[in-house]
């Protein structure tokens, strides 16, 4: 286990029924690049997303939303809408709205146009109240309150594990939440200097390709839904709780989801509305949010105000860090950004205080490493300022404070691939450009990243082998675009000696064995060990059948290329399967607990090259080199795609995306993708993902 070239060996006791881990170099199928299995379905339009759901007699649902940031609801008159043909209405009787776009009334009609007519027929009378929509204004004493009572923290599968924190609340500020390590006062006393900076980051909306949506139908007393979700089973569980049903009475399907970065856990309000409308109407109902309401109500990455104070020695060693953050997730919680400062580098002493600030804006939620981009920006900016103050190479400063053996190797690999040694040349070229009157300057920089290894307990996989040789793999996990079918098939193909394309991977159905939600980078690490266990158990049982066909001992049977062999005798896969007793051979695999292995925090480093027009402020990213430790990749193409996607979202966040709020009205002015700009293909730089060879030594995969 450990970094290639620096590995350690250790004896372990395997969990009961769990296969032994792969040995180094014994993976003929996994750990490689290959085309994704669902690609043809997607590019030909055969993949069915929730937006595509259609059924005879189906109704189309819409939500009447508040045009105000803060108001009392005086009355809701649905009488005209109720008289329209085929219209059903769900009126929860809301008394107060706290953000522009908050749901007030849901309805469904035979066509989308009819639903829009019904929306216009609903008359809501508001008593508009004062609002506060900026982080700075909401923090002030005497600011308009968003909530009169204390708010409890709510967590989803996209958040870091841990209990919700009970924190003090004064005005609109909830917190601070204190945390840290070491003796901060001692660290500052030992410092030869201090540096303090403040950074701010803006809101980033999820802007999933497929907006949030749900299709619901009641079949007797069973609720069947198709959902655009990151959690097949979390949707099932929430709907079962709302409607007081046993879990087997809620069936959730999620074979294809058009993107999810933390906002698609659970049924959400639109999903509950959809199911209630379907129950009232006795007909299937589709709710597909429009882009505007999706941007307003479905969640976002909170903004942040971060203060970083570093104590340092003149050789660049950081002796202590004092960190304070405020952020607004609108009417929600969870804006903390201190995870990075506490864990990314080897600062010996850290004191952190994180506070949520409520505003009259749509709720924030988990989004791709919650809190880390904001915290990373703050800490890395402070390190850059410190390097400048000390006249020190920024990379050398980071190496001075980075005790991670893995990331030190990544810094070295990345610097070489990127050409970090060009710094002096670039400085001279910029001086020449300035002398010639050119506004263009070239710059390079580097920064670290960090995430954690989380495992969802209870994941189970079923492998079913039919007598005609068909092999099916079943798990209820959803695919949010990462292509999870492909690594599942690769693992089973490796154990069974079959072509990857020959396997049928069936996912996204809550009637299948339990699978993890897709959040916090938990999916593959939770699922693949269970896949391998199921595949090994199925192979062992099939070897028993093959031994009888070949007239050999089970210990002599080998399988490769779809052929069983033993002492000169051969039988192809289908011939052996035809001798399976009964109709099918079924084997299951469970995700066993991790054994004690290497440090499996996920370390990474990025190097970037940009061109800046110093007159206009336009920044063009030319190249990014990203070096990452992802353990042992099952499917390299998929891992590299995830790295590329994260880089593109990061560039988009930094340079393109900006939610614009009118402070006078409290309304979001650009809830769209025309004026809320996201990075496009013409803005995409050269991206070089590099995976370091690391052996976690914690499970069978």
Where are these regions (language model features)?
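Active-site "cap" helix and flanking loop/linker of ATP-utilizing ligase/carboxylase catalytic domains
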Residues: 637, 641-675
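Generic N-terminal targeting/processing segments that precede catalytic cores or assembly contacts
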Residues: 65, 92-94, 620, 629, ...
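Structural alpha/beta core scaffold segments of enzyme domains
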Residues: 1-627, 684-686
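Generic long, charged, amphipathic alpha-helical segments
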Residues: 501-507, 677-700
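Conserved phosphate/anionic-ligand binding catalytic regions in large, soluble enzymes, centered on
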Residues: 261, 265, 375, 484, ...
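Cytochrome P450 core scaffold surrounding the K-helix E-X-X-R motif
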Residues: 631-635
């Amino acid at each position: 286990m450990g970094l290639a070239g620096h590995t350690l060996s250790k004896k372990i006791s395997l969990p009961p029924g769990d296969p032994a881990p792969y040995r180094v170099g014994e993976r003929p199928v996994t750990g490689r690049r290959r085309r994704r299995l669902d690609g043809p379905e997607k590019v030909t339009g055969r993949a069915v997303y929730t937006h595509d759901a259609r059924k005879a007699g189906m109704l189309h649902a819409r939500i009447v939303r508040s045009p105000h940031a803060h108001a009392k609801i005086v009355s809701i008159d649905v009488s005209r809408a109720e008289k329209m043909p085929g219209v059903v209405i769900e009126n929860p009787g809301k008394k107060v709205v706290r953000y522009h776009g908050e749901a007030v009334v849901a309805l469904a009609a035979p066509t989308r146009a009819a639903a829009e007519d019904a929306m216009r027929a609903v008359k809501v009378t508001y008593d508009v109240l004062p609002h506060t929509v900026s982080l700075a204004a909401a923090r002030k004493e005497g600011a308009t309150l968003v909530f009169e009572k204390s708010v409890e923290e709510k967590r989803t599968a996209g958040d870091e594990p841990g209990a919700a924190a009970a924190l003090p609340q004064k005005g609109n500020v909830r917190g601070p939440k204190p945390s840290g390590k070491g003796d901060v006062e001692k660290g500052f006393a030992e410092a030869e200097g201090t540096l303090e900076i403040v950074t701010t980051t803006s809101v980033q909306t999820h802007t999933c390709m497929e907006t949030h949506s749900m299709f619901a139908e009641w079949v007797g007393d069973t609720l069947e839904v198709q959902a655009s979700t990151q959690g097949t089973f979390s949707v099932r569980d929430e709907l079962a709780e709302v409607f007081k049903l046993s879990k087997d009475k809620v069936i959730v399907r999620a074979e294809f989801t058009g993107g999810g970065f933390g906002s698609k856990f659970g049924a959400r309000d639109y999903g509950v509305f959809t199911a209630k409308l379907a129950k009232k109407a006795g007909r299937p109902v589709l709710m597909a949010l429009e882009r505007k309401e999706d941007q307003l109500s479905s969640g976002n990455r909170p903004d942040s105000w971060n203060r970083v104070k570093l104590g340092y020695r003149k050789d660049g060693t950081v002796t202590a860090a004092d960190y304070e953050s405020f952020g607004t997730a609108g009417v929600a919680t969870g804006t903390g950004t201190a995870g990075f400062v506490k864990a990314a580098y080897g600062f010996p002493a850290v004191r952190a205080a994180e506070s949520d600030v409520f505003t009259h804006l749509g709720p924030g939620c988990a989004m791709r490493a919650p809190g880390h981009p904001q915290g990373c920006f703050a800490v890395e900016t402070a390190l850059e300022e410190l390097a400048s103050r000390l006249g020190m190479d920024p990379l050398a400063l980071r190496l001075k404070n980075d005790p991670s053996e893995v990331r030190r190797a990544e810094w070295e690999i990345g610097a070489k691939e990127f050409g970090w040694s060009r710094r002096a040349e670039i400085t001279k070229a910029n001086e020449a450009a300035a002398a010639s009157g050119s506004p263009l300057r070239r710059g390079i920089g580097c920064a670290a990243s960090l995430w954690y290894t989380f495992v969802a307990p209870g994941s189970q996989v079923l492998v079913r082998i039919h007598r005609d040789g068909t092999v099916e793999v079943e798990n209820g996990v959803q695919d949010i675009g990462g292509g999870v079918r492909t690594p599942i098939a690769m693992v089973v193909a490796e154990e069974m000696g079959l072509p990857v394309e020959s396997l049928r991977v069936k996912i996204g159905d809550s009637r299948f064995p339990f699978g993890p939600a897709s959040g916090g980078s938990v999916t593959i690490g939770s699922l693949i060990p269970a896949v391998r266990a199921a595949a090994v158990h199925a192979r062992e049982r099939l070897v028993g059948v093959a031994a009888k066909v070949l007239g050999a001992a089970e210990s002599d049977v080998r399988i490769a290329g779809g052929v069983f062999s033993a002492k000169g005798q051969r039988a192809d896969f289908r011939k052996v399967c035809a001798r399976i007793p009964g109709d099918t051979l079924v084997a299951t695999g469970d995700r066993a607990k991790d054994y004690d292995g290497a440090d499996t925090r996920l370390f990474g480093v990025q190097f970037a090259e940009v061109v800046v027009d110093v007159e206009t402020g336009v920044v063009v990213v030319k190249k990014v080199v990203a070096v990452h430790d992802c353990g042992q990749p099952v499917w390299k193409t998929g891992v590299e795609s995830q790295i590329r996607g994260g880089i593109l979202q990061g560039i988009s966040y930094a340079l393109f995306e900006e939610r614009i709020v009118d402070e006078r009205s409290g309304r979001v002015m650009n809830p769209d993708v025309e004026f809320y700009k996201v990075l496009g293909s013409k803005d995409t730089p050269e991206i070089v993902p590099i995976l370091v060879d690391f052996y976690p030594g914690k499970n069978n995969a």
